[in-house]
A protein has these predicted regions:
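Acidic/polar loop-and-plug regions of large Gram-negative outer-membrane beta-barrel proteins
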Residues: 301-305, 317-388, 403-436, 479-504, ...
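Structural signature of Gram-negative outer-membrane beta-barrels, strongest in the C-terminal barrel
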Residues: 322-324, 436, 455-467, 506-633, ...
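Outer-membrane beta-barrel translocator/receptor signature
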Residues: 210-211, 227-229, 240-319, 325-329, ...
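C-terminal beta-signal and adjacent terminal beta-strands/loops
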Residues: 731-743, 764-812
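Gram-negative outer-membrane beta-barrel transporters
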Residues: 525-526, 651-741, 781, 811
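Acidic, small-polar-rich N-terminal luminal/periplasmic segments of exported/outer-membrane proteins
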Residues: 51, 56-58, 71-73, 113-261, ...
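Face-selective signature of the C-terminal outer-membrane beta-barrel domain
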Residues: 381-404, 428-545
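Membrane-embedded beta-barrel scaffold of Gram-negative outer-membrane proteins
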Residues: 386-390, 394-400, 404-410, 579, ...
Length: 812
């Protein structure tokens, strides 16, 4: 086979990037080279690659126009380095002697000659169209880093895994991440927990979005994934780039990007309980030069549930424009719109008997009123600018504006229920409404430099956010009857209610600012040292208005220049394995609790120690992680023991601890077989509890299973059956229990739930290169179990019975 130009291009369109710093030598692609090439326009990156490797690079300018490289840092052969550099670009490469040829995958630029090495660009940051369960790098720490380089545990849900396991919302994601559980209602707004603590640190494209119960105004938990191509979950304290929050971890949602090539995809689904969903996603260049690109994706879902009366409608639209202002500057702007209308979606779950035994409810039981509703709407606008300052330095500016509205009527049925005659339950209801908005801005620079002869990386930045929330509470019709006790919980039909007059309005504002920095130094060849710190300013104000008597109750809390550090060591044992140790902190403001003198309680403080071992194999397509961790949370609010009970006074005297072990493997283990498996062992305890010393030494997070195993594997059959895929997975966990958190807690009655094992499966078939048909089956053996366990009074939920989802995916 000989070199030949495609008919589409003439010889004069070929560009030649040659080695300038190193002499040309035969078989240069086999020699190890220490590369340092930042993310930048691909033409510039290929020039730097040629200079650093001594390899000639041939390409057509039209083939790489509008494309950007990924970051390449480390020691690789020229072949390995070029593969990593071309990740996400959609181009092929080939070597012949000391020359590398670049072409579009369609082959319309060059007919490649016979070569000594032929390869395809491997995994990068973007996981779309990689068909991989892992990623080459993540961005949850501001810069692109492989999982092996990060001294904390990070789990990634890639685009392919989201498709294979039929995941459509962020709340669905929580059920797949090892060691993560959720608490909350069945309307999709469940709060995730990891390692015994709440995860209330959220990011979008690496930009902090205060969204948790302790620091945020809006909620992201119910978000549709139509806007995002992957989800990154970091476990442990994450205060360095985030600011205030709990020590459970952080979640980074990464938006889909626009391609310069026209692509159209659709997803059509139909499943159990009248579950129907449609997606349409279109993208492509908007000018001939492909410097302006756009993408528009939309989804609509309507469904019922396995319990009586529950149903919902959800709609989402995502749009983004990307513009190459010049070879060094990329601008992005867009929006995400989402709304959900939920009806009778069981916001408070099921109760148990007061002696801790289970009530024999049918799985279809719904104790919510038929008039219950929960309607939410969210609109977000975003802008991002990335500028390559030079070969080593890059600046990023990102800003978001979000509006979030809620209109709801909730009812709850629970109480101290007698196991003899089923009496003792009550029914309660109220209306709610919220109007919230939030601004977030982040500006940072990151780059590489030499320090004492060693290559180093620094990140310096600042971010700020402003949020306002106006939350109203409403009475309902037959309000006095709402607290009537129910004579028999097993023969009870919830009444209908209607929202009436407003009785309370709470206005909250939250301002956060932060300065942060991180330095990573390669002290000597196998060892990287990472040090970082963040100074945070936090200002929370609340004004609660009693609409009945006009009385205002105001409170505020400020934290000034609160500093949290981060320290980490990463030691490369060999090209495949690295070991690490890290220490991270975070703080959590304690809102609406005061000391006896009226001053705000000092923030809670969380610190996490972690020691681990990470592996990367098969050119980064398989990643492993083993970690032991300990998180201590101090300064929890406790009622002041030196003051009378009539004084609503607190001291920061509580202390809890969580510790354990995690193991995870994700990626391709053999041709056609992608899998993920994660095991978590986690215990927690009260270390200090002045209000109830009986609790000390007992379990703190009782609803977190001590043992949890989550697995999933998908196999693309080989040979003549290669159009078929089969998948299977499981969720296996030990028992949990719920108990009261007030009163005589140490002697409280437990609501215990045993462990369970749930198995799922998938079968897929490629009709042709454009169409795939599949069916997903959840809970194959139709196991009856509780997916969430509350106290004896409420908040226990059955898990989904066996159900199926049929899917047709098209790609053009």
């Amino acid at each position: 086979m000989s070199h030949a130009l495609s008919k589409h291009f003439s010889l004069t369109t070929l560009s030649l990037a040659m080695a300038m710093a190193l002499p040309l030598v035969a078989h240069a692609q086999e020699q190890a080279v220490n590369f340092n090439i930042p993310e930048q326009p691909l033409a510039n990156a290929l020039q730097a690659f040629g200079q650093q490797s001594g390899v000639q690079v041939l390409y057509s300018p039209n083939d790489i126009q509008g494309l950007h490289s990924t970051r390449l840092n480390g020691t690789f052969s020229a072949q390995e380095g070029l593969a990593k550099l071309l990740q996400e670009t959609g181009v092929n490469y080939s070597f012949q002697g000391n020359a590398a040829s670049i072409s579009r995958k369609s082959g319309d630029a060059l007919e490649l000659a016979a070569t000594s090495v032929v390869g395809q660009a491997g995994l990068g940051v973007n996981t779309e169209n990689t068909r991989s369960y892992t990623t080459g790098a993540v961005t949850i720490g501001k810069s692109e880093r492989s999982l092996k380089e990060i001294p904390q545990t990070v789990t990634v849900l890639t685009a392919q895994r989201i498709k294979d396991q039929n995941i459509t919302t962020l709340n669905d994601v929580y059920g797949l991440v090892p060691g993560v559980v959720t608490y909350g209602a069945l309307n999709g707004d469940n709060q995730p927990y990891a390692r015994g603590f709440e995860i209330d640190n959220f990011q979008i494209n690496g930009i902090p979005i205060p969204a948790g119960t302790s620091t945020g105004i809006t909620s992201l938990n119910w978000s549709d994934l139509i806007s995002y191509e992957r989800v990154e979950v970091l476990k442990g304290s994450a205060g360095l780039f985030q600011g205030a929050g709990s020590p459970g971890g952080a979640i980074n949602l990464v938006r889909k990007r626009a391609s310069g090539d026209f692509k159209l995809s659709t997803v059509t689904q139909a499943g159990t309980w009248d579950n129907y969903r449609q997606e349409v996603d279109v993208q492509g260049a908007l000018n001939e030069e492909k410097t302006l690109r756009g993408r528009l994706a939309t989804s609509y879902n309507t469904r019922s549930y396995f319990y009586d009366g529950g149903k919902s409608k959800r709609a989402s639209t995502y749009g983004v424009l990307e513009f190459d202002l010049n070879p060094d500057t990329l601008l992005s702007a867009g929006f995400t719109y989402q709304n959900a209308d939920n009806r009778s979606t069981m916001d408070w779950g099921l109760p148990g008997y007061k002696d801790g035994s289970k009530i024999d409810f049918k799985r279809s039981t719904n104790l919510s009123s038929p008039s219950d509703y929960n309607d939410v709407e969210s609109t977000q606008y975003f802008f991002e600018a990335k500028h390559q300052l030079n070969e080593d330095w890059k600046a990023t500016l990102a800003t978001n504006y979000t509006r979030f509205n809620l209109d709801a009527l909730y009812s709850n049925t629970g109480g101290q229920i007698d196991p003899i005659d089923n009496s003792g339950a009550y029914n309660w209801a109220e209306g709610r409404g919220e109007n919230n908005y939030q601004y977030n801005t982040d500006l940072f620079v990151n780059g590489n430099f030499d320090m004492l002869g060693r290559r180093s990386e620094v990140i310096l930045g600042a971010n700020l956010s402003h949020s306002k929330r106006v939350a109203a509470r409403y009475e309902v019709t037959d309000y006095n009857r709402a607290y009537d006790f129910i004579p028999d919980i097993l023969n009870f039909t919830p009444p209908k209610y209607a929202r009436t007059k407003k009785y309370r309005t709470t206005t909250s504002t939250l301002d956060q600012q932060g300065l942060y920095g991180s330095l990573r130094v390669n002290v000597f060849e196998p060892l990287d040292v990472i040090v970082g710190a963040r100074a945070s300013w936090f200002d929370y104000k609340q004004d609660q208005l009693n609409e009945t008597n006009g009385r205002h109750t105001k409170s505020d809390m400020q934290t000034n220049a609160k500093v949290v550090p981060f320290y980490g060591l990463v030691y490369a044992l060999n090209p495949n394995w690295s070991t690490y140790v890290s220490y991270a902190e975070i703080f959590t403001p304690q809102l609406n609790v005061e000391t006896v003198d009226g001053s705000a309680l000092t923030p809670r403080s969380g610190d996490t120690y972690e020691l681990g071992l990470k592996g990367e194999f098969y050119d980064g397509t398989l990643n492993t992680n083993f970690a032991i961790f300990r998180t201590t949370y101090t300064g929890l609010a406790q009622r002041d023991p030196n003051q009378p009970t009539t004084c609503n006074c607190y001291v920061a005297g509580g202390k809890v601890r969580s510790q354990g072990f995690e193991a995870e493997i994700t990626g391709r283990v053999m041709p056609g077989l992608d899998l993920t498996a994660g095991y978590t062992y986690n215990t927690s305890e009260y270390v200090n509890n002045p209000n109830n010393p009986d609790l000390e030494g007992t379990t703190f997070q009782t609803s977190m299973p001590e043992h949890m195993l989550r697995t999933w594997a998908n196999y693309q059959l080989q040979g003549e059956y290669s159009k078929w895929q089969i998948g299977a997975g499981s969720t296996i966990q030990s028992g949990v229990y719920g108990r009261h958190v007030g009163g005589n807690v140490g002697k409280g009655i437990k609501n215990e739930t045993g462990g369970y094992a749930i198995y799922n499966a998938r079968i897929g078939y490629d009709v042709n290169k454009n169409v795939n048909l599949s069916v997903n089956i959840e809970n194959i053996f139709d196991r009856t179990y509780y997916s969430q366990t509350g106290t004896i009074e409420s908040n226990s939920y059955y898990g989904n019975p066996r159900n199926m989802m049929f899917t047709m995916r098209t790609n053009f």
